[in-house]
Amino acid sequence: MRAAVLALLLAAALPAIEFKDGYANSNGVKIHYVTAGQGPLVVMIHGFPDFWYTWRNQMEALAPQYQVAAIDLRGYNLSDKPEGAENYDMRLLIADVAAVIKHLGRDKAIVVGHDWGGAISWQFAFHMPQMVERLIILNLPHPNGLSRELATNAKQQEASAYARRFQTPDSHKALTPERLAGWVTDPAAKPKYIEAFGRSSMDAMMNYYRRNYPREPYQATVAPQRLNVPVLMIHGLRDTALLSPALNGTWDWLDADLTLVTIPNASHFVQQDASDLVSKSIKSWLNR
């Protein structure tokens, strides 16, 4: 009993984590982000369908040691939503991340990405390695691995059927905020997701796939360069969209160390399915 009371008193004595909103200008496109904490910069990039709030637990875990900035990707929530698939080209998505880092007065950051945020993070590291201190990827294989599996693995081709549907011109018309929030299991979070998706552009979400996802006939491709930056990959093995065989060979495409954490009971949204384990894995890896 005394231990429980002491724990409550200690928790009450700890300062609450303060979340602050901000906006960066990326060539005329307003990018919303939320920051917490002070220290080395950690930029966190969500995927589909999601928004900055997906990182809430990791932000609280990291804020005592780091300044964490979680981005709303263009098209989502409080960020601008330019029309036209050309405005969701990967080079512009990379520029958005750079704009946030520079807006916060930094030259580089630890970059964390999940799903589309992971795809952007890989490409950011390829094209702007000088701005990446470390790279953390959740449930998005190295581009070499994903393209190989799309070209050769019938199971991954079947698993990617949703992406082919998303690439069609009218795919956004079938989406609603409630449908997009269907994956959210936290009852307290679901209304926040529905509200955020109500502010988002469904067409913009689909433009990520129309502009950047590989199209049939699939071909194995090679990334523009090898990375010489430490990489942590965390992958929920119950992911039905991005299958784990795509992880094989990642170590052959990196010149720095790779740490791979697989979580058997987590699905695609590993940062929420296994929130504590993901947070502890990231903190432990960063504090090596």
Give each language-model segment a name.
Residues 266-275, 279:
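Catalytic histidine-centered segment of alpha/beta-hydrolase-like enzymes
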Residues 51-52, 119, 266-267:
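A short, glycine- and basic residue-enriched loop/turn
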Residues 17, 29-31, 69, 76-112, ...:
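Flexible "cap/lid" subdomain of the alpha/beta-hydrolase fold that forms the substrate-access gate
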Residues 1-41, 64-66, 107, 218, ...:
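Alpha/beta-hydrolase fold catalytic core
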Residues 35-80:
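Conserved HGGG/HGGXW glycine-rich cap/lid loop of the alpha/beta-hydrolase fold
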Residues 27, 39, 74, 264-266:
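Short, solvent-exposed coil/turn elements at secondary-structure transition points
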